Each structure stands twice: as C-alpha cells, then as structure tokens.
Amino acid sequence: VGNNKLVYNAFNYQLMSISQINENNKEEGVIRTFDEDENLISIAYIENSKGVMGIYREYYPWGVLKNETPYYTSEINGKLKNYYPDGLLKEEYTYYNNKKEGLATMYYESGQKFAIENYKNDLKNGDYYMYYENGNLGMKAFFVNGKREGTIEFYEEDGKKIEKNK
C-alpha cells in the first residue's frame, strides 16, 4: 500500500481520518477516524475490491473499546461485541452474512448475565432466558421465527416460580 491520506475538517483544521492509498488512488489498508477532539474513535481495514475485512473497532472518546464488529467482504461474520463505557462486555451476538445466527448473550454492568437468546436467520428462535443480577432466572420463554410460542415462565428474585402466561 502506498501513501497516507489525511483528512481535516475544513472549518477548524482538526484531523478527521487517516487512511492508506494504493497505487490506484483508492483507500486500502488501515483507516483510522477521529472525533472533534482528535480522539481515535474507529479503526477498520479495507482490502482492495473486498471492502471492509477483519475486526472493525470503535472507541469511546476516552480510549476504551466500544465495540468490535467482524467483517468479511463487507459483511458481518462472527462475534459482534459491544462494551460498556468502563470496558466491560455488554453484549455479544453471532452473525453470519449480516444476520444474527446462533447464541446471543447480554450482561449487566456488573458482568453478570442479563439474558441469553438464540437466533436463526436474524429472528429469535429457541429458548430465551432473562436473569436477575444475582444470577437467578427471572424469565423463560420460547420463540419460533421471531414470535413467542407457548407459555412464559416468571420467577422471583429468590428463584421461586411465580406465574405462567399465554
């Protein structure tokens, strides 16, 4: 890859992005973008003719990782992860060809699991569990093609089952 390309805001001359330019004068390689205070906010990798490749990373202004999105030929493929402002994992989803596929897990800011759900072709499919922050099950449901089926089971914070709903 050839030269670096720096893009500045025309009004205040603040750095907006740095990218690499190939011999055909197209962006290729690592691209970094910055906020108005010139804090790094994202890093991506562009591969000639294939688009975004690898892990796209976005950052909070104070430098903590905000999310990681796995790309292959500009489509999301793999585990997408979002983080709380302190850097702890907030949620993770598995993607295949830009669609949620498989297990997804959400977390409280404490790090304890909040919910677990399953996806098929971008729709909720299968068991869905929601938890109290103490780790006890709070709700259990089942989905088929994005629609709830059957009963929802609810539990008190101490784990005692409290009701069923249709």
Residue ranges of predicted features:
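Glycine/tyrosine- and acidic-biased, solvent-exposed loop/turn segments at the edges of beta-strands
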Residues: 1-166
